[in-house]
């Protein structure tokens, strides 16, 4: 007798690992969430039935919280499931069982319920219980790194190093940029080079390493990295590992006094933006005009300034005749305010241009920021991410 696929799957999967394998296989086969959502609905239904028979099963309730999040896309629902479970059974649970729940709550609060203070609360409870690991210290380090409390973050990453056999690349990377922010540039270089060896195409790692090499005076070592970053520049950053923004690369080249490259990237950005009309002033203009001055390209600087202002003035004329903001919906006063805002953008660029060309003023680069890497998932035995034999 033929057994339907759903029934056959239901018979086969008796353990968490069997469910995880089934889920991961379905995800590999399907490129769309809608096409593999059914496996989490099946898993949710299975777990709910199991918990009716044994409502105190820690593994099942934690897996149910994960299934709920995947099905309903709502971290708060999952958090509520686990916290209600704790209220009901906390006295009956041993420390190992509580630790599993606390770690899952930390992950869910950080990424899906958007409350990293509660995430910190559960991480701290784990440390107080003696349930320490590379994951716990790394995520706590991330918490302080996000708040620019670099010394506290460094303490966490130093504790993480005691569990070096458990570490992943994001652990070393976040430790590396924390060392950088604390002024330990040589140690940061060592850590970021380790990351680079593992992921030589990661835009984020390349950027952080290049910045660090500037401060360790390793310009020769930085050269191929600066070249490689040019291949990864983009108007938008979809994935931290894959793209670097134009403004980020301009900042970096300017810091290295790579003025020809600074000009190249700024003009490449203008071309890709198809900048036919308006612009918003940002530090990139300062670095661009200063770079042209250092290269002796005064005529080019003058022509580019004139070109940008002419285009922007045409945009202002369109506002005046109601082509941009329909006068049916916007008052004369509001349209007047829009025009003033646009004129101010021109004024800012003119002011910085004159200041650079007519004095010894050098714009200072104070805005470079290194993004931290987030742990994709540290849910205990997450069926999507756990490693299977």
Please report, for each region that a protein language model flagged, where it lies by residue.
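Eukaryotic alpha-helical solenoid repeat scaffolds
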Residues: 15, 19-27, 31-47, 215, ...
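Residue-level detector of the short coil/turn that links helix A to helix B
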Residues: 38, 72-73, 113-114, 148, ...
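Single-residue signature of alpha-solenoid repeat helices
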Residues: 39, 43, 78, 118-119, ...
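Short coil turns that delineate tetratricopeptide repeat
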Residues: 55, 90, 96, 131, ...
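Start-of-helix register in tetratricopeptide repeats
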Residues: 59, 100, 135, 169-170, ...
């Amino acid at each position: 007798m033929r057994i339907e696929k759903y029934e056959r799957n239901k018979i086969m999967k008796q353990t968490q690992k069997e469910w995880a394998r089934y889920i991961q296989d379905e995800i590999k086969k399907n490129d769309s969430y809608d096409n593999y959502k059914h496996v989490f609905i099946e898993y949710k239904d299975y777990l709910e039935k199991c918990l009716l028979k044994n409502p105190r099963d820690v593994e099942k309730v934690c897996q149910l919280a994960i299934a709920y999040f995947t099905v309903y896309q709502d971290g708060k629902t999952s958090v509520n499931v686990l916290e209600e479970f704790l209220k009901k059974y906390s006295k009956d649970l041993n420390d190992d069982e509580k630790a599993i729940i606390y770690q899952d709550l930390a992950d869910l609060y950080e990424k899906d319920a958007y409350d990293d203070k509660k995430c910190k609360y559960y991480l701290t409870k784990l440390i107080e219980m003696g349930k320490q690991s590379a994951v716990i210290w790394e995520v706590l380090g991330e918490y302080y790194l996000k708040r620019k409390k670099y010394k506290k973050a460094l303490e966490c990453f130093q504790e993480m190093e005691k569990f070096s056999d458990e570490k992943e690349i994001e652990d070393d990377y976040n430790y590396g940029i924390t060392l950088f922010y604390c002024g330990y540039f040589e140690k940061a270089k060592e850590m970021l080079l380790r990351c680079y060896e593992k992921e030589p195409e990661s835009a984020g790692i390349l950027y952080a390493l290049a910045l660090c090499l500037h401060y360790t005076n390793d310009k020769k070592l930085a050269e191929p990295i600066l070249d490689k970053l040019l291949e990864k520049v983009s108007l938008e950053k979809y994935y931290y590992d894959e793209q670097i923004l134009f403004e980020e690369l301009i900042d970096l080249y300017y810091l290295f006094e790579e003025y020809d490259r600074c000009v190249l990237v700024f003009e490449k950005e203008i071309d890709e933006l198809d900048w036919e009309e308006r612009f918003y002033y940002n530090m990139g203009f300062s670095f661009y005009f200063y770079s042209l001055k250092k290269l002796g390209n005064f005529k080019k600087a003058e022509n580019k300034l004139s070109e940008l202002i002419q285009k922007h003035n045409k945009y202002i004329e369109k506002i005046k005749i109601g082509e941009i903001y329909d006068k049916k919906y916007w008052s004369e006063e509001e349209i007047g305010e829009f025009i003033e805002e646009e004129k101010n953008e021109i004024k800012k660029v003119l002011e910085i241009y004159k200041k650079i060309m007519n004095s010894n003023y050098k714009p200072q680069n104070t805005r470079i920021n290194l993004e931290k890497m987030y742990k994709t998932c540290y849910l205990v035995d997450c069926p999507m991410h756990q490693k299977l034999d």
